[in-house]
Amino acid sequence: SAIISLHRNKLGERGLHLLQRQRGEAVTALELLQREKECGSITTFSSQLDRALKGGLPVGKVTEICGAPGVGKTQLCLQLSVDVQVPLSFGGLEGQVIFMDTEGSFVLQRVGDVAAAVVRHFSLVAEDGEQKDAMQTFDMESILSNIFLVRCHDYVELLAELHLLPDFLRDQPRVRLLVIDSVAFPFRQQLDDLSLRTRLLQGLAQQLVSIATRHNIAVVITNQMTTRLQDSQSHLVPALGEIWGHASTTRILLQWEGSRQVAAIVKSPCCMDTAVQYHITSEGFRDVNQPENSDQPEIPLTERRSL
């Protein structure tokens, strides 16, 4: 360009080379669409939620899972940690996962239950020789060996681990999923300085987006709920403030509606505002069986407050 030509002598050859490396890559919209298709997605093992998400949890994006305690956020994360390892012959990613646990919620026995159920399912549906061969190595031991667990006791440890993560990902190219359960806990419990917390969260959000796009992995973060007063009434909203709400590409709200557990997609660039029923079983995150005459398993969100 003219600017580069003008300053060539001042920059020198080495400086010019570095500058050119930093220039943005120009791609067409069609190329971007093709890249997204190639990235793939991770099944949630809920066909209704997968359908609402246009195929499952997107790779290369940041997804936030919000909800009150006990509604199933961690259970969905554990399910995804197993599902990301589904063999390629079944349409899976055959990847590995990094699970950053800030609350001590990772329970090995529960992971074992979910893994055993997934292995049983694919053993039953395996048809051709390639799929049957894949099941020879897709077992409990291989699933557990592909989960890298990182226990973070405070926000300093969490930020430090994320700082080291790019080097780890270069050494482990099969990692396709990063889970942080939860991102809210260390910041809300241990950091009272709101100004500092906001700056750190902004930096963290940028870092997660960079990790997702540069390393082509799905980033899943869980968030707690807090109370906000609006029109003299209190409402439950995702924690960490409105600025944090821009961190994710997709936001899924898990909530109770009476006796029903509902997963609502409240933010997404491509999915309609939809809610589907789910429940947590001994085998993991699953659909709720719909009545036989039900042709519409998804529940339109007719009223939705801005989250």
Give residue spans per PLM region:
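The Walker A/P-loop phosphate-binding site
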Residues: 3, 11-133
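Hydrophobic/aromatic beta-strand patches that form the interior of the parallel beta-sheet core
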Residues: 63, 98-100, 148-150, 220, ...
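Intrinsically disordered, low-complexity glycine/charged-rich regulatory or linker segments
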Residues: 1-5, 9-25, 32, 269-271, ...
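Conserved, well-folded catalytic cores of nucleic-acid-processing
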Residues: 22, 52-56, 68, 83-91, ...
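Flexible glycine-/small-residue-rich
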Residues: 67, 101, 151, 182, ...
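Phosphate-binding/switch region of NTP-binding enzymes
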Residues: 198-202, 206-307
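Conserved inter-motif catalytic segment of the P-loop NTP-binding fold
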Residues: 92-195
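Amphipathic alpha-helical transducer elements in NTP-driven molecular machines
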Residues: 46, 50, 59, 74-75, ...
